[in-house]
Structures are given as C-alpha cells and as structure tokens.
Curated annotation (Swiss-Prot):
PANTHER family: OSTEOCALCIN. Its main location: secreted. Gamma-carboxyglutamate residues are formed by vitamin K dependent carboxylation by GGCX. These residues are essential for the binding of calcium. Decarboxylation promotes the hormone activity. This is Osteocalcin. Keywords: Biomineralization, Calcium, Disulfide bond, Gamma-carboxyglutamic acid, Hormone, Metal-binding, Secreted. Residues 1-47 form the Gla domain. The gene is BGLAP.
Length: 49
C-alpha cells in the first residue's frame, strides 16, 4: 500500500506509540527515556508497558 502523496510505503503502526507520546509529554519520563530507553522509563512512571 502506497501513501497517496509521497509514494512511499506507509510505516507499520507502532502499538507503543500512544504510550511513547504519554512519556514524551512528561518531562521527567522523557528525560529518563533518553538515558535508559522508553520502555524502561515508561514502566517506572506508569507501570507495565
């Protein structure tokens, strides 16, 4: 399936994207994610991914 504008394949939707966005909106979670990775940071703030 091709994107109508760019002619490039549409990337597979990331099931973790909504959680990644939640973490990015929390400055503390976002900063921690830069050091230890998104999934580990998310778990520390919000519980299991």
């Amino acid at each position: 399936y091709l994107d109508s504008g760019l002619g490039a394949p549409v990337p597979y939707p990331d099931p973790l994207e909504p959680k990644r966005e939640v973490c990015e909106l929390n400055p503390n979670c976002d900063e921690l994610a830069d050091h230890i990775g998104f999934q580990e940071a998310y778990q520390r703030f919000y519980g299991p991914v």
